[in-house]
């Protein structure tokens, strides 16, 4: 194992510049969030690669200190989809802690989970039950961190929620799981996520788990930068056809300084698309460090499909996959110490891209049971294979950045074991790097977040029934008040204890009309 830092003379490394801070989080009074150093088994899991780089001074993509996410903002806890949506879409910096699975929770019925077509009859008399999807327009200066459930040993799972980063800067997402499995779509439309908004089935976008882009106004002028996706898990499972779901982690347009590290991608078809077409190429676009990621059972392609951009691709493991990393139009990359096993076509640069390969002893690529190998390689198990031409380049990351930090370059033979141990969510205790204690819900802060969306997107927050929220306080509806005049309204705490009147926070309100019909809902009161 090499622990390496690349440095041009006259500059400090990103790791030396990184601030080491401390935090103190109280149950109801929050101090600004900060990040502490982080190791496990003696291994450093803090940020490195292009996301740690500040960028070039004088450009849109410059940020002092590199990617810091919500550092300096409040640490908050999201227990519901509405809270998650409000905090991540707010104009304020936040570190958002989640310790439970989250979906919209709004039931709907489809013909089949593998196809997901919404039925005309939503009574539940037929079809399979699933939940409506939704979209979160992630605003700048946000950190999202999952906490492992001690009973299940799993990190929080976000189901049918697409996280869109549209022309934004400074985002961190760590230790979370994502899936679109079973997301509903319209029978007559494309495969777009369908949400229930104000009682109306509404298409809200492609079924990407995470989509990074910069084409809100114009792809020629918009930009995004400084994004770190780390220790996350992405999957979808069986699908009716290869177009049922979209990407797990897609990236397009003019975005720079990204690191995707220690992630697990599995059970999917089209995994990662970086560049939506051959025209989606800009000077300096999509500078990505991609390391210690584990692709398992991707029965399709895009590990990733790269168009344009500069990618440092190292210490990644492919197992039981089909088409792998495909370097297309004007893509440039540096490949180090990756292990490819039982994969049809792990990497190719013969269709418009160019590749530099580290062939140092112990750090060259290893193939086992694969087909379509790069020229000059053979399988270590002797399996027969075809050969692909390599289009060469001499590019290395330090040609693009003034400084470049790479914590580790592990030997290729060690990569399968390392990725199986550390790649994915729930493998490393991450949240303690951001808070000393898990905070409590804060209704006042939730209300503030709803009322202060980022002006760049002006995205709305929706409640547990799909209705737009104007704030974190709500009252009993007019219908319920009318019913109360002839019957009664009862109030309960979340634990089921009956109370005489609503209290500050979340209450259960049960109304019974004159005909004996009962309606129960959660109500948030200031």
List the model feature ranges, each with a label:
Residues 18-31:
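Bacterial N-terminal signal peptides
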Residues 49-97, 492-499:
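Acidic Gly/Asp/Thr-rich repetitive segments characteristic of extracellular carbohydrate-active
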Residues 85-92, 105-143, 154-174, 183-222:
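Extracellular beta-strand-rich solenoid/capping regions of secreted or surface-exposed proteins
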Residues 140-146, 150, 169-182, 197-199, ...:
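Right-handed parallel beta-helix
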Residues 473-526:
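C-terminal outer-membrane/trafficking sorting elements
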């Amino acid at each position: 194992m090499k622990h390496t830092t690349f440095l041009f003379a006259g500059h400090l490394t990103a790791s030396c510049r990184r601030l080491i801070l401390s935090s103190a989080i109280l149950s109801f009074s929050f101090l600004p969030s900060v990040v502490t150093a982080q190791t496990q088994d003696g291994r450093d899991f803090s940020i490195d690669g292009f996301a740690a780089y500040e960028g070039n001074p004088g450009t849109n993509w410059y940020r002092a200190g590199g990617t810091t996410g919500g550092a300096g903002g409040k640490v908050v806890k999201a227990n519901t989809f509405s809270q998650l949506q409000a905090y991540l879409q707010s104009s304020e910096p936040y570190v958002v802690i989640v310790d439970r699975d989250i979906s919209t929770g709004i039931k709907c019925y489809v013909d089949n989970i593998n196809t997901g077509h919404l039925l005309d009859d939503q009574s539940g008399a037929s079809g399979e039950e699933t939940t409506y999807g939704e979209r979160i327009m992630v605003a700048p200066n946000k950190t999202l961190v999952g906490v492992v459930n001690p009973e299940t040993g799993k990190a929080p799972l976000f189901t049918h929620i697409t996280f869109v980063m549209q022309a934004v800067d400074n985002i961190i997402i760590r230790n979370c799981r994502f899936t679109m499995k079973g997301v509903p779509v319209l029978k007559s439309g494309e495969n777009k996520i369908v949400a229930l908004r104000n009682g109306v089935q509404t298409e809200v976008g492609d079924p990407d788990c995470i989509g990074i882009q910069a084409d809100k106004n114009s792809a020629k002028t918009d930009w995004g930068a400084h994004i770190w996706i780390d220790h996350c898990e992405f999957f979808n499972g069986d699908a009716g056809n290869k177009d049922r779901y979209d990407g797990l982690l897609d990236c397009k347009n003019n975005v720079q300084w990204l690191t995707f590290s220690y992630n697990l991608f599995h059970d999917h078809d089209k995994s990662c698309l970086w560049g939506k077409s051959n025209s989606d190429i800009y000077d300096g676009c999509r500078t990505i460090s991609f390391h210690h990621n584990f692709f398992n059972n991707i029965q399709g392609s895009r590990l990733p499909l790269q168009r344009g951009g500069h990618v440092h691709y190292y210490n990644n493991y492919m197992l039981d996959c089909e088409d792998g990393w495909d370097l297309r139009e004007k893509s440039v990359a540096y490949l180090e110490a990756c292990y490819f096993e039982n994969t049809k076509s792990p990497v190719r640069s013969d269709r418009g891209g160019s590749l530099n390969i580290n062939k140092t002893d112990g750090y060259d690529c290893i193939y086992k049971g694969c087909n379509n190998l790069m020229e000059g390689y053979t399988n270590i198990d002797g399996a027969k294979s075809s050969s692909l031409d390599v289009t060469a380049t001499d590019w290395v990351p330090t040609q693009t950045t003034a400084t470049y930090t790479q914590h580790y370059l592990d030997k290729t033979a060690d990569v399968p074991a390392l990725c199986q141990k550390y790649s994915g969510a729930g493998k490393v205790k991450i949240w303690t790097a951001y808070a000393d204690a898990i905070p409590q819900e804060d209704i006042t802060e939730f209300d503030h977040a709803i009322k202060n969306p980022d002006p760049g997107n002006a995205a709305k927050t929706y409640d547990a029934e799909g209705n737009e929220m104007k704030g974190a306080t709500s009252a009993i509806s007019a219908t319920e008040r009318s019913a109360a005049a002839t019957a009664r309204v009862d109030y309960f705490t979340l634990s089921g204890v009956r109370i005489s009147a609503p209290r500050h926070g979340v209450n259960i309100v049960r109304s019974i009309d004159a005909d004996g019909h009962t309606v129960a809902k959660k109500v948030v009161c200031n």
